[in-house]
Regions:
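Feature captures hydrophobic
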Residues: 1-135
Length: 135
């Protein structure tokens, strides 16, 4: 069971996205990449940055990033690890999380609101990865 966040978790998430017919259909017109910034809590001592490049229903690449300056993604979503845990365990809807600022978004919220089904299917891909959390 990979720890969240880790390069092993990101690799399994990438594979889950690319193996999901539901995500492929929901995101067939999506073009955009993300940083998912995991703010430290519990056993975590520093932030972790997960990068994923999503293009027409597939992940073109996903990795851990050491520094925010490595890439310039269209979207950055930040939250403490406990909030990410709620999202991955489907206890917090990601759109609701952004609207209530539990998940902090940098990027075009309108574009994300037009792709609600894709966002929900992306979370479903997260649930396919058995995860161990530091909180």
């Amino acid at each position: 069971m990979p720890k969240f966040p880790s390069k092993e978790w990101v690799a399994e998430f990438h594979d889950a996205v690319n193996g999901s017919g539901a995500y492929a259909k929901a995101a067939e017109n999506w073009e955009g990449d993300f940083y998912f910034v995991v703010e430290p809590e519990g056993e975590m001592s520093e932030e972790a940055i997960l990068y994923i490049d999503l293009w027409h229903g597939k992940s073109r690449g996903a990795s851990m990033v050491a520094d925010r300056s490595e890439k310039s993604p269209e979207f950055v979503i930040s939250a403490p690890v406990s909030v990410w845990k709620k999202v991955i365990e489907v206890k917090l809807d990601p759109i609701q999380g952004m609207m209530t600022r539990q998940l902090k978004l940098k990027g075009n919220m309108v574009k994300i609101m037009k792709a609600v089904k894709a966002a929900k299917e992306l979370v479903n891909c997260c649930t396919m990865v058995e995860s161990e959390f530091p909180v």
